[in-house]
Amino acid sequence: MSEKDFVQVAKLGKTVGLKGYVKLHNLSDFSSQFKKDATFFIKNTKEMLKIKHYNASNSTVLFENYEDIEKAKELINLILFQSIEKSRQTCKLKKDEFFYFDILECEVFEEDKRLGKVIDILETGASYLFEIQSDEKWVEKKYPKIFFIPYLDKFVKNIDIEKRQIFCTQDAFLILENS
């Protein structure tokens, strides 16, 4: 598997107590994936970490083979990864919810006009913004290289993950024009 087959799910922080617990900073929307016996990868290594205990109330985690403070210090600042395949299995989505990794690189259209492709998703607190890299055709016409579309019904009509396409209302092109 290549690096693009994995997604960041958490960052490990400082040690907590003497038994090897470390602070877990969840980088995903799915805290349910952090449970006893769940396994995660460490970037640029083949090493996997297996959860021995997870305390959701204070976001601390104890990994097998890291059950003392000295050993646990080796984990500080590491990023945990999960395979996209396993994420799909363990993280259940509701209707009209999507994984970030499914939205990224989707082409964005307003009717038959290709506006660009999603290169990032920003959380604004109340909602999300799709960061769009403008189609070369619009850049040549002196429109901005990057613009943002709110992930709201007013702007996004339909997302087709199978075709990797997002269809927007007429207001999306207005955003591009006025960016």
From Swiss-Prot:
UniProt keyword terms in alphabetical order: Chaperone, Cytoplasm, Ribosome biogenesis, rRNA processing
Name of this protein: Ribosome maturation factor RimM
GO CC, alphabetical: cytoplasm; ribosome
Organism per entry: Campylobacter jejuni subsp. jejuni serotype O:23/36 (strain 81-176)
Known function: An accessory protein needed during the final step in the assembly of 30S ribosomal subunit, possibly for assembly of the head region. Essential for efficient processing of 16S rRNA. May be needed both before and after RbfA during the maturation of 16S rRNA. It has affinity for free ribosomal 30S subunits but not for 70S ribosomes.
GO biological process terms, semicolon-separated: ribosomal small subunit biogenesis; rRNA processing
InterPro entries named in the record: PRC-brl_dom (IPR027275), PRC_barrel-like_sf (IPR011033), RimM (IPR011961), RimM_N (IPR002676), RimM_N_sf (IPR036976), Transl_B-barrel_sf (IPR009000)
Signal peptide annotation: none
